[in-house]
């Protein structure tokens, strides 16, 4: 019998070097010191002129997805939910889009 020379292959697995991470810095706290602060109170007349009250009167379920998103964007969550928002052209445009679902009070 002829003995065959068997070649055994050894696979050497090299480990990848670990990535060194920078040490985590401790979060430092900032102290805010207010000296001689004056509080400015807004009058009710100025806040009433610049705001609009909207009430969700009808359900937005079953409506167009863009109309649903507009209602959520206005911050309304359920029927008879009232929200007071600043009276800006952006808000007015959103109100006009879904006016059939809302009651608006200036």
Curated annotation (Swiss-Prot):
Transmembrane segments: none annotated. It comes from the Bacteria. Disulfide bonds: none annotated. SUPFAM superfamilies: Ribosomal protein L30p/L7e. Keywords: Ribonucleoprotein, Ribosomal protein. GO terms for biological process: translation. GO terms for molecular function: structural constituent of ribosome. GO terms for cellular component: cytosolic large ribosomal subunit. The keyword Ribonucleoprotein applies. Pfam families: Ribosomal_L30 (PF00327). Coiled coil: none annotated. PANTHER family: LARGE RIBOSOMAL SUBUNIT PROTEIN UL30M (PTHR15892:SF2), MITOCHONDRIAL RIBOSOMAL PROTEIN L30 (PTHR15892). Part of the 50S ribosomal subunit. Belongs to the universal ribosomal protein uL30 family. This is Large ribosomal subunit protein uL30. It comes from Ruthia magnifica subsp. Calyptogena magnifica.
């Amino acid at each position: 019998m002829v003995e065959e020379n068997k070649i055994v292959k050894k696979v050497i697995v090299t480990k990848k070097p670990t990535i060194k991470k920078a040490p985590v810095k401790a979060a430092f706290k900032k102290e805010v010191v207010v000296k001689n602060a004056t509080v400015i109170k807004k009058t009710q007349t100025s806040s009433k002129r610049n705001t609009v009250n909207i009430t969700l009167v009808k359900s937005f379920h079953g409506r167009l997805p863009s109309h649903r998103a507009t209602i959520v964007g206005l911050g309304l969550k359920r029927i008879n939910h009232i929200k007071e928002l600043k009276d800006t052209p952006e808000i007015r445009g959103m109100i006009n889009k879904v006016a059939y679902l809302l009651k608006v009070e200036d």
